[in-house]
Amino acid sequence: MQNNENKVALVSGANTGVGFQIAKALLENDYIVYVGSRDLQKGEAAVEQLGGSSKAIQLDITDSGSIHSAVEIVEKEYGYLTLLVNNAAISHAGTPGRTLEEIMGAQRASIAPVSELRKVWDTNVFGTLALTQAFLPLLHKAPSARIVTVSSALGSLTINANPQNPYRSNFDAVYGASKTALNGIFLSLAIDLENTGIKVHLVSPGFTATALNNFQGTDSVEEGSKEPIRVALAEDLPTGSFTGPADFSGEDNILPW
């Protein structure tokens, strides 16, 4: 166990995409970074690319045993956690190989299989909360700590309720609504922890070309990761913030709930 002068971060789903870019930026800013990946070999391959003080850690946020093992490793090696980045998510649980349009069409509230909602929400909502709750004791042991959860502007009720929003038809019952639920739970957590040394932030990336959308996003992973990286590195943001890219957000990148 080392002293708590080191900045120690864990990023879930960090072997690729936005999570990988966040891990890279944290390493460049003197963090020790645990690279969470369901497949440990993929995590180790990412660490080979990242170098520095990166460490691969097997982490399936839908598996309580995997979460418990990850907590034990961090506790044994450092005894605390400075930053938890909740990035792991899935966009669907249906037939692979479909286009983004096919996936979104099948996720409309009138026809979406409840089994698919359960599968996606198990990762995006319940798994994310389970991981966070498990690491709270180690976050409390840091002098100050932050939880940064990657959400989506697609989960904003205010944006989707606006008839002038050209993208409102993309708000679906599976992925989009999972981000709405995620926002609500983590705003509740921010309120719960507001008198502690732990800040809670939600952040939306751009429409990034990643495996989450079959690489059909309009932003490069580097461009789309800019706002999550900014939030992950910012230590002075007020707790309970929800920010995103400039095309949806207002002053100071603030998104409406």
Language-model features, listed with the residues they occupy:
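Canonical Rossmann dinucleotide-binding motif of NAD(H)/NADP(H)-dependent dehydrogenases/reductases
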Residues: Q2-Y34
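Conserved glycine-rich Rossmann-like NAD(P)H-binding loop of the short-chain dehydrogenase/reductase
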Residues: N29-A45
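The beta1-alpha1 cofactor-binding region of Rossmann-like NAD(H)/NADP(H)-dependent oxidoreductases
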Residues: L40, Q58-E72
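A glycine-rich helix->loop->beta "capping" turn
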Residues: G52-K55, I73-N86, H92-G97, M104-G105, ...
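Hydrophobic positions on the long internal alpha-helix
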Residues: V85, L131-F135, L139, I185-F186, ...
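C-terminal helical subdomain
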Residues: T180, N195, L202-V203, T210, ...
